[in-house]
């Protein structure tokens, strides 16, 4: 599949914020069979992918949608019928057995001259997805990360202090940043956190009380930029230090927290 890419412009829809990753993904699809975009829920992965689908002949499958998942009960048969399209697979960590099938489909396509631009994979849990895909798709996939909006994306050609102030106050999740007012933005963030803690995290396996994770997440926010003191956090939560490490690993895996090495050069 030949994918035309114009790197001098960003893909843009009226009323949407340009994402700097869009042209990079398009370029990567032109020379990789598969591209994976990792990022927390609501960071804009699906919006970015659907915007790309407007430029390329594509189909979109959400692995959290039972109907879409049913279509892939025989993945090779279904996907080979769409070998001329870019297949977008959203929340693919919900279907870990799919990766081995993707490997066979990609290798078959290479033999038949359809090497690149086959799959755009979206995932919200980095470690699981990386482990599942790296074993099956080594040499066939490129990984990228989409985080929240950054200043370059929210600022127009003219410097706008209000936009920048809103970014610092509301954060980089698009729905929070673009809310009609600060109150609605706060409501969105509150609901997002509650849903993540009470619904999304349990579906990934961990059985940790939502209230405990909320307290832990809040303490991490107050400790931003500081050296992690696991013992202090453990004492505050009434758990062992090793439990704090487990909680932190979970937050990092869900791309909700960034962890930097103490020895990282500045």
Q: What residue spans do the PLM features occupy?
A:
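Short regulatory helix/loop adjacent to the ATP-binding pocket of P-loop NTPases
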Residues: 126-143, 158-160
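Short glycine-rich substrate-engagement loop in P-loop NTPases that contacts/grips substrate
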Residues: 58-86
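Conserved catalytic/switch belt of AAA+ P-loop NTPases
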Residues: 99-127, 135
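Pre-Walker A adenine-sensing motif
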Residues: 11-29
């Amino acid at each position: 599949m030949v994918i035309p890419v114009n790197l001098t412009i960003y893909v843009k829809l009226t009323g949407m914020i340009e994402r700097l990753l869009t042209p990079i993904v398009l370029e990567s699809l032109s020379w990789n069979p598969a591209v994976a975009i990792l990022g927390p829920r609501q960071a804009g992965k699906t919006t970015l992918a659907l915007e790309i689908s407007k430029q390329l002949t594509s189909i979109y499958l959400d692995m959290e949608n039972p109907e879409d998942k049913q279509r892939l009960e025989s993945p090779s048969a279904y996907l080979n019928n769409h070998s001329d399209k870019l297949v977008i697979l959203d929340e693919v960590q919900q279907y870990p057995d799919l990766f081995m099938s993707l490997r066979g489909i990609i290798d078959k396509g290479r033999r038949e001259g359809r090497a690149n631009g086959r799959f755009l994979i979206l995932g919200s849990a980095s470690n699981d997805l990386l482990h599942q895909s790296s074993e099956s798709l080594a040499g066939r996939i490129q990984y990228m990360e989409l985080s929240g909006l950054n200043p370059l994306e929210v600022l127009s050609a003219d410097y706008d202090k209000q936009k920048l102030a809103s970014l610092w106050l509301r954060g980089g999740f698009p729905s929070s940043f673009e809310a009609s007012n600060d109150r609605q933005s706060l409501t969105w963030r509150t609901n997002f956190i509650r849903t993540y803690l009470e619904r999304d995290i349990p579906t990934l396996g961990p059985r940790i009380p939502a209230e405990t994770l909320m307290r832990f997440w809040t303490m991490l926010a107050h400790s931003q930029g500081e050296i992690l003191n696991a013992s202090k956090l453990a004492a505050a939560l009434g758990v062992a230090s090793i439990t704090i490490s487990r909680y932190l690993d979970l937050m990092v895996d869900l791309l909700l927290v960034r962890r930097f090495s103490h020895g990282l050069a500045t």
